[in-house]
Design a protein with these regions (language model features):
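Mid-domain alpha/beta scaffold segments of enzyme catalytic cores
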Residues: 1-130
Length: 130
């Protein structure tokens, strides 16, 4: 089994919309799925995407995310971030993003960041959060 080491100094872009199917080996899956249906050797990330935010069920979604963090196959938090094209108010996006940053740090998991037209805000948050 491989071990992930915490390294907060590097930024790695793993974003893709056109991934080739995995024919052998291990795969990282980043989408909505039922964790009990996962096969051994498959890993996933979980997060609250800015496009999926509403003011009405945010706490429920955060609670679901907290519960998933105990799963051994969850290897990253995200996609989480800021998106000026999303319908959710920026204030809500920032609050939920901060919560996900805290969770990724608490569980020592990488954070997959989504950022659209909000790089200045994201960098300001990085300075604020540390």
């Amino acid at each position: 089994m491989w071990k992930m080491e915490r390294n907060t100094n590097n930024i790695l872009d793993i974003h893709t919309h056109k991934a080739e199917p995995v024919s052998a080996g291990k795969a990282i899956i980043n989408r909505k799925l039922a964790t009990d249906a996962l096969c051994e050797g498959y890993f996933y990330s979980a997060g609250i995407h800015p496009w999926d935010l509403t003011e009405f069920d945010t706490e429920r979604r955060l609670e679901c995310l907290r519960e998933q963090l105990a799963e051994k196959q969850l290897v990253a938090v995200g996609e989480a971030g800021l998106d000026k094209l999303a319908a959710a108010p920026m204030q809500l996006q920032v609050a939920v993003f901060k919560e996900q940053v805290e969770l990724s740090e608490k569980y020592e998991l990488p954070l997959i960041i989504h950022c659209v037209k909000a790089m200045d805000e994201l960098l300001a948050l990085r300075k604020e959060i540390g």
